[in-house]
Each structure stands twice: as C-alpha cells, then as structure tokens.
C-alpha cells in the first residue's frame, strides 16, 4: 500500500499530462452554464500556497524577459535540488501552477472570439449591400430616389428662376408696375361685383314698382264697383290700402339701393380707368428708361468696337505686318539656302562620271575642282572664278508652282554666288552665308522707319492707300466690313445725337 503523498503526486501528474495532451489548437468559447463550469473555475485559478511559485508565475510583472529566463533557470535548479525536502502540499502547489502556466488563459481565447464576431458583424452589412445591389427592389428604390432628387432639383430651379426674375424686376423698376397690375386685377373684380349689385338692385326696384302698380290697379278696380262690394271685397280693399304704404317704402328703398350701387359701380370704373392710365404711364416711363439704357449700351458697344478698330489698326496691324515681313525674310533665306545647296550638288555631281571615262576627261575634270573648293570655302585662283560664276548662274532654277518668288530667288542666288566667289570669304562665313543674304535682303527690302517717328505714320498711310496687290481671306474681309459698318453707324449716330433738337 502506497503512502498518501505519493498517490496525491501521481494523481496530480496524470491530471497535468491530461491537460497538456487535450489542449485544443484554438480555445473554444465556454458556455455560461453547464457541467463544464467547475473546470473553468479551476483554470481561472491563479494563486498558490507557495510564495516561490507565486513569484515564478508573476515573474513577468517584476523583471525584463532576459532576467526572467535566468530566474526561471535558477528556480528550476533550486526545485531539482530541494525536491526531496518539499512537503506533499508544496509539491501539489508546484504542479498546479505549472499546469496553469502551460494552459492558455481563457480570456485571450474569448477576446479572439469576440474580435472575430465583431469583424463578421462589420462585414455583414457590406455583404448584404453587395447582394442587394442586383435586386429589382434595390434598383426600383434607387430609381425612385433619383426621380425624387430630379423633381426637387427642378422645383428649386423654378424657384431660383422666379427669384432671379424678381431681382431683375426690382433692379429695372418693373416691380411697381407688377403691383399696379395686381391692383388693377382687384379693381376689375370690384367693378364686376358692383355691376352685379347694380343688376340686382335694378331687378329689385323693378319688382317693387310692379308690385305697387299691381296693388294700385286692383284698388282702382275695387273703387269702380264700390256700389257692389261684398264683405270679401271690403277686406281686400282694406288690405290693399294698408299694403300700399309698405310698397311705397320698399320702392323708395330699392331705388336708393340702385342709386348707391350705380354710384359704387361708377367709382369702381373711374378708379379702374385711372389705374389703367397710371399703369400705361408707368410702362411708358419704364420702356423709355429701358430704351435709353439700351441706347447707351449700344453706344458703349459701338465705342468699344471703334476702340478695338483703332487699336487693331494702330498697334496690331503694324505688328502683324512686321511679323509677316520677318517670316517672308526667313522664307527667302531658306529658299536661298536650298538653291545654293542644289547648285553645289549640281556642280559636284559630274565629277565621278568624268573621272571614269578617260585620262583626258580626268584632266578636264581637274579644272572645276577649284570651283568646288571655292564653294567649299577655300581660296581659289582668278581663273576658276568665272567658271564657277557661270555654272552657278546658268544652273537650272527650282520650279515653283504659282509663286512669284522663283526669279527673285534665282537672281539673289546668282548675286550671292558671284559675291562669294569674288570675295573668297572664310569658311564659316561662306557656309552660313548669313551676311551676304542679309545685305541682299536689306538691299531689296527698304528699311522700315522707327514705329514712333513721323515717317512711320507717313509710311503707314501710304501703305493704306497704296496700289499694291494683297491676298486676303473671306474672314478678314468680313471682319473689316463689319468693323467699317460699326464705325460708320457710331459716327452717324453721334452726328444725329448732336444735331437732334432737344
């Protein structure tokens, strides 16, 4: 029979091993009630009788991780050394914290479960919205929302347009005329009611007259046969005589009512006509003011057109002319360069053919070599200069289609080639040929005077009234015609405004 401490130790070890082997990968959420409530309470137990075991279980609270490992090693060594001196109660207290430290705390598992639940709860509306987007009810609801928004926008647009019109009427002074219109409508309604009362009063007055006349006729008939009255005739006569005064009073009242209704109708008609005349006068004043404003606006537009015309003629037109001249110069220089390159190629092209024929042709081909070297910007003799000049001048000119520049360009090219061969300029100046071309262009095109001098104005006037031919587009012609018409209208309007008597 084993002693009690050994049995207790074995039972505790077996329970600790069972707890290690049956540990799940992810702790499940424990129910609040049931037969597993007692083990949960045992797992949540975090105290022990042994002070050393308590310190071991709570060592992360008192030290850093590096020191904790050293302390754990020292504690395990001390536990191995002093295992024989421990009491059974100490051993049981030691085994229980080991099992508790190896088992994960249920709070962490519950926290993970709650986090997963919260994530699912957050993602569930997104999934539901994604599923509902394809449903007909969702599309119908979306369409109804869009239609409501469109209706609201249109209502706001109408109100905004009305408010804008009201503000415009306030600025132009038409709001008073609108008030007069409303007053006229009220007066028309009042006149209509007054005329209706006049008709009713006339009918009542006519009825009272008829009633009194009928009573008087009956009285006269009774008086004519007075000698044959019966008791009923006497009572009838008495009744008619008594009602005659009442009929007379009713006739007078209806007559007065008719007169009052007629006076009221006349007053309403007079007030209506007065309001109509006032509205007509105010509308005339408003139309005159608008016409005056439109006249001043027209004059302002005419002035702006005249100012733009003057600015265009004084500032823009010279700048455009200068730009056109500059572009023309660049095009002429480019054409000269192309012509020179073509002439140079034509001069150098026959050399291979001549060298491949015979030795005599080689000797003859040696003669234009100085010319080519002269074209290549090397000094030449006086004998080679005429040949190069003749070849350059007599070379085929470039064919231009419907352009007046070809002869002009070929002449300038011939002069430039002559000057370059005679002067034998340096290599860089001969290749570029800028100075000779500029001199030729300055010789052909007269220099323009400064834009601020009197000669510039004289030159501009001469250009405006010169006989030189120009190519103009339909748009420019239409623009000039419209500007001229606007300027003429402005001048004539100014003259009429000055001459018109006040």
Swiss-Prot record:
Residues 500-502 are mitochondrial matrix. This is Sensitive to high expression protein 9 homolog, mitochondrial. Residues 139-276 form a coiled coil. Residues 60-112, 121-140, 350-400, 419-447 are annotated as: Disordered. It is a multi-pass membrane protein. Residues 65-74, 91-101 have a biased composition (Basic and acidic residues). It is found in: Mitochondrion inner membrane. Belongs to the SHE9 family. GO terms for cellular component: mitochondrial inner membrane. The lineage of its organism: Eukaryota, Fungi, Dikarya, Ascomycota, Pezizomycotina. GO terms for biological process: inner mitochondrial membrane organization. Residues 75-87, 378-395 have a biased composition (Polar residues). Homooligomer. Keywords: Coiled coil, Membrane, Mitochondrion, Mitochondrion inner membrane, Transit peptide, Transmembrane, Transmembrane helix. Its main location: mitochondrion. Required for the maintenance of the structure of the mitochondrial inner membrane. Involved in mitochondrial morphology. Causes growth arrest when highly overexpressed. The chain crosses the membrane at residues 296-316, 479-499. It comes from Aspergillus fumigatus (strain ATCC MYA-4609 / CBS 101355 / FGSC A1100 / Af293) (Neosartorya fumigata). Residues 317-478 are mitochondrial intermembrane.
